């Protein structure tokens, strides 16, 4: 087992990893930027190393600085968390080449699933159902327009290297296609440095279903059932739940089997999520659920899976990265009850939900609910990072009870962020 773990991240996920490390007897090392010098993850860790200025490009995205911090602090392993460098195959390889344990999948697996067109081709070859669409190398406007006509409108244009809701355009008719394509390509080039796109049939009544998978270094893969992340805002998840409502056992078996097959296709090691899109116009059916992409890291919404299975996914990550076999076989895994997670953002609803910055003057959360956060009252909310400040997770015997518990939180969550330059901004988390 590793002895000293550096967490190449910040905020709530860094704090969450540190807690599991402490519980399992592993020392933790935090990294921090100028803006995060007094952050909660720095205060919680056994040691902390400064890695650069506040901008992520000069700190949390500096793989060389992070590896140097690990070596300087005596860490023998690096956990990337999610976001930042967590799905960067070159960083993963550099960590391994430096003689450190990489808490994540093999760089080749990250690379294989990193480009959406290649990933879909690989999945189709492995027998995993994929969304009808175009993933060809010919990116000429005429070829793409012709492919869209063959798929049938509406279609979705997606950046091959996309993510986080960027580089996506829904197109209703052929007359709109050319301008939508140009807009999508411009955004993709600016955000990812790659303007290539793929086309998918747009599902008019979509459900976003994802399956948690885990693989070890001995060729074993299991699934930990599904999550539903259909409630989104600007293509980003807002409320997640597990299991998925309306999922019968036959459909669950089919989608989970497809997810395990996908993981085996890339010799997957560690925590991963296979994302599917379902056409729910006639209910959830196995023949109307298609592979969308694979996230080769821990997901933001992993706590809902932990709540229904009783498994600490971060502990599994640490054990598997250390060379252990999966702690449980598929037959030993089961779930009970229902879990829901809501994300709490420091945003100002009076100003188009723009991020609120300043001092977190009030941060009162209810007892009896799992809270994952990277801040405490008195901490600074800066403009440099994602405005998500906490996740609230509830569990109940049924979906109705879990939803009721989540909705009641509205009366017990009080957050005030004071922006001294622009006056006070109140954020009330409404469920």
What are the functions of these language-model segments?
Residues 1-274, 278-302:
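N-terminal beta-alpha lobe that positions the nucleotide/phosphoryl donor
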Residues 168, 240, 341, 388-394:
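Short, hydrophobic beta-strand segments
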Residues 183, 217-247, 296-323, 356-373, ...:
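Extended active-site and interfacial segments that coordinate phosphate-rich ligands
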Residues 184-185, 197-198, 208-211, 259-261, ...:
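Glycine-rich, charged/polar anion/phosphate-binding loops
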Residues 246-276, 295-349, 431:
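Active-site "cap" helix and flanking loop/linker of ATP-utilizing ligase/carboxylase catalytic domains
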Residues 326, 331-385:
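Glycine-rich active-site loop/lid that clamps phosphate-bearing ligands
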Residues 392-410:
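Short, well-ordered alpha-helical segments
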Residues 408-410, 414-431:
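A short N-terminal helical cap/helix-turn-helix that marks the beginning
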């Amino acid at each position: 087992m590793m002895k000293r773990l550096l967490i190449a991240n910040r905020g709530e996920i860094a704090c969450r990893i540190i807690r599991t490390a402490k519980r399992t007897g592993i020392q933790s090392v935090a990294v921090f930027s100028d803006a995060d010098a007094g952050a909660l993850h720095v205060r919680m860790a056994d040691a902390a190393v400064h890695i650069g200025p506040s901008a992520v490009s000069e700190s949390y995205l500096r793989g060389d600085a992070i590896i140097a911090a690990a070596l300087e602090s005596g860490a023998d392993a690096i956990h990337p968390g999610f976001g930042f460098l967590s799905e960067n195959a070159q960083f993963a390889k550099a960590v391994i080449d430096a003689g450190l344990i990489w808490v994540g999948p093999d760089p080749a697996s990250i690379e294989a699933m990193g480009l959406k067109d290649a990933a879909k081709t690989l999945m189709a070859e492995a027998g995993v159902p994929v969304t009808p669409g175009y993933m060809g190398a010919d990116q000429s406007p005429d070829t793409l327009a012709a492919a869209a006509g063959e798929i049938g409108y509406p279609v979705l244009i997606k950046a091959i290297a996309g993510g986080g809701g960027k580089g996506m355009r829904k197109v209703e008719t052929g007359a709109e296609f050319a301008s939508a394509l140009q807009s999508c390509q411009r955004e993709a080039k600016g955000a990812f440095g790659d303007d290539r796109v793929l086309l998918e049939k747009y599902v008019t009544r979509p459900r976003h279903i994802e399956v948690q998978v885990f693989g070890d270094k001995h060729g074993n893969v299991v699934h930990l059932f599904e999550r539903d992340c259909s409630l989104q805002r600007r293509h980003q998840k807002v409320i997640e739940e597990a299991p998925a409502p309306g999922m019968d056992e036959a459909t669950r078996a089919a989608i989970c089997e497809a997810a395990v097959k996908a993981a085996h296709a890339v010799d997957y090691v560690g925590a991963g999520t296979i994302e599917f899109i379902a056409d729910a116009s006639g209910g959830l059916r196995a023949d109307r659920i298609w592979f969308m992409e694979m996230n080769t890291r821990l997901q933001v919404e992993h706590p809902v899976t932990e709540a229904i299975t009783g498994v600490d996914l971060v502990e599994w990550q640490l054990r598997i990265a250390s060379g252990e076999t999966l702690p449980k076989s598929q037959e030993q895994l089961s779930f009970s009850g229902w879990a829901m997670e809501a994300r709490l953002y420091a945003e100002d609803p009076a100003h188009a939900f723009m991020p609120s910055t300043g001092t977190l003057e009030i941060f009162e959360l209810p007892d009896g609910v799992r809270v994952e956060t990277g801040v405490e009252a008195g901490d600074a909310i800066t403009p440099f990072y994602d405005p998500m400040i906490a996740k609230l997770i509830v569990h109940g015997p049924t979906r109705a009870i879990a939803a009721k518990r989540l909705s009641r939180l509205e009366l017990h969550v009080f957050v005030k962020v004071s922006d001294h330059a622009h006056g006070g901004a109140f954020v009330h988390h409404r469920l």
